[in-house]
Amino acid sequence: MFECTHCDLHFESKSKLATHQKTKKCTAHRFLGFTCQKCWDHVKGYENALNHVAKCGQKLQTFEGIQALVAQLALHYKCEVVFDHENGKGQINFQKVFNYTHPSNLQEMREPIEPRSMHVWYKMLRKYSDQYLLGGHGLYLNDINYTLFRLSDAFKFLAAKYDARTLLKMLWIEPTYKLFHVKDGIVYVLGKIQSQTQEGRKWFGDTFCLQRNETIVKCLWYRDPTLEQLWSNTIPLLKEILNLYLDLGTWLLKRKNIKLKNDHKIHHNCKTIIENVFKEYDVTNLIENITVLNSRQTFTTMFREILTQHQKDLRLPSNIHHVFKDDLLPSSLGGQEFSLMTMTEQKISGGNQYHLMYHILPESERPMFETKI
């Protein structure tokens, strides 16, 4: 399910969500909240407000209404109610609570690209500028830790347009804020930041998303000397572009009226056909990016070379306190073995899909894959 956070509504597909968010009811009312004068409940969304008012049968007294209002405040503030029943007076004390709600996990948001949508996707690939794509990507600090993700369709466009070295630099080296640092030959990755308000309140988080009058005062850096922790955290990236490769490859072969037979004797010929089709449509970078992200040695070697070349660009701001920890970069996926065969969102049925998957697998995994089809 896809949620419109402005209207508190859910939709079965991303296309329906996109259609809804273009409607006047959403665009004109997305920054407005509605408070029911019967029950004092706060409602988001124009349609939700109309439905609530029509169905609400409560009629709270003044004190109950105040309690309901406090309950609403408690969602965003730490509240305390002090009431003097003898004198009929009371006081409400509340203090801001600093919570950050991340976007939904990428794995819960993905749906396979339909053939008719694939045509539109490929058309848009050449339309969007790099500035538009990078702005739409909305990089978060979590793009490093990958416990939660903020990866939009813009990432797929970048993975199709650029080779692996350029893609890695665009995502992690060129952004204004620095997520990597090399100290005494050891690679450190930014893991947490401490922010502060003008009043002096401090809290730790993992995002650069700040409100007005809030500043970053401390950065915590974690060791990743071999870059293997970082590599294992890129599995969501790999899974996303692998499925794009299968969707796009199936669509391109069908568009060229190519049907590959389920015969291992013609593997070499099929590989040449697939490579030529991807080359004709100028999307061979997808194949390279999957190959690099799927190889621990290739990825770590390439990324260390990039960090070395851009070490002068990784200087840290002097107005922030930096703490370098001996702990490894946190990773929920560290040390796990994985295979491209377990990352597909669709069942490989044979023919074109079979050969697309076969030729993207490492040599060592191909015999096992043949036994599963």
UniProtKB/Swiss-Prot annotation:
One example GO MF annotation: zinc ion binding
Keywords: Metal-binding, Zinc, Zinc-finger
Record-linked PROSITE patterns: ZINC_FINGER_C2H2_2
Disulfide bridge positions per record: none
Renumbered zinc finger spans (C2H2-type): 2-29
Similarity comment: Belongs to the IIV-6 302L family.
Protein name: Putative zinc finger protein 012R
